[in-house]
Amino acid sequence: MKLLIKTCLAVSAATLAAILLYVIAQRPTPVSAATSDAVDRIAGKPDFSGIWEANNTANWDLLTHQAHPMVAQPGLLPNTVVLAAPVLALGSLGWVPGGLGVVEGDEIPYQPWAAARKKENEEHWLDRDPELKCFQPGIPRGMYLPHPFQIIQGNSKIQMIFEFANAQRTIHLTKMEPYPNVLWMGYSVGHWEGETLVVDVSDFTDATWFDRAGDFHSDALHVTERYTLADKNVIHYEATIQDPQVFTRTWKISMPLYRRLEPNAQLMDFKCVEMVEETMYGHLRKHQLVKHWEGKTMNVDITRKIPPGEEVLERYISGNPPAKK
């Protein structure tokens, strides 16, 4: 039986850099083109090395969508929503930006039971989205998160490091034995079809989503990626999705990925585990935060009462010691 090890501890970018030493050591010097607009090459193949980032709203919703509040609750009139408390507090920042879809045909072909599950996921997005818990994003979602990622290309493998959660993946360009476990980022084996890198990704966990709109998959997910340089600063990215347990047919997404051109472009640490300790481990608190529901909105009272006898200790812990008498 496949084992799922949910490793969510973020490591520093410096630690991940050490992992890349083997890839860098085997990496031959790129052959520079005659002009600045031509594509660098390694062993006769396009060199994808660099820092890249998508520029779309696919992480919010793969399909075409209008701007709408992140969280809402039913209003008195049909098709009218009432903003939930978190949205009111955030103002315009609490809204999802509108965007054009990246799915071919603008439709995800769910089986009936899965369509109902997707709708339920979307309604409970704040409780269920793995991104909120700092889980590794999976593929293809990692490719269009609103965070940059770095590609380092060698002869036998290509390494990708993602700023979000310091996630990483390896694309093996030589024949490898099947991996014995499931992986958050899948198991990737690539080959070249002319100027296009084709990557077969399998052995996924079922714990990742495609976006914040509740689009999901099972552990039978199979992704075929295609990377083609439109020019030296733009990758045309395609991903064909197969999952017979969830979808009625295969479907495809496509988008451009853009090279970051700043002279000092680099990945920064985004150790999101430290940002979600309450979400991940709040249930282990000795004195848990008070939660109550108003309709479909969960309110959290962060002004908890200090247990009797612990007032002085709590003041020192919070950096607000009692005044000296």
Language-model features, listed with the residues they occupy:
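PEST-like low-complexity, intrinsically disordered acidic/proline/serine-rich tracts
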Residues: 2-325
